[in-house]
Amino acid sequence: MEATIVCIDNSEWTRSGDYAPTRFQAQADAVNLLAGAKTQANPENTVGVLTMAGKNPRVLVTPTPDLGKVLNCMTDIVIEGEANITSAVQIAQLALKHRQNKNQRQRIVIFAGSPVQEDKVGDTKRISMHSSQQSAPRGMRSSQQRPLWYTCCSCS
């Protein structure tokens, strides 16, 4: 059982046509595939969607088993500004913290269609490892812990 938040890059970089038809559409197709696979794998799996660009990252859909809600929210996304991965991960962690089923494993999937600065990657890793250490069961060493996030797609 998993609760997954998919972080979508809706920055200006995703207008690029180097992936047919655009980087953004390639992400939308990947979200469709990922959300479908997650919800079919286990009926208790949930998927949520968060945008990373604009004024602030925004949760479009909280984790839900309803594939239709996930797919519908993709049509309303506005491409604007620059992606803020660090803030997006923090907001995704909050959304996962308040999930309905606390027995679900937490997973954050990040689609990056824009360049990611080296220092931002370090900040994001630090945030994910810090939250992993806070939520680790007693007796678990830090070497046994896995960070909550991983980059699934980088189109830059």
Language-model segments: which ranges?
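Charged, surface-exposed interaction regions in soluble eukaryotic proteins
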Residues: 112-146
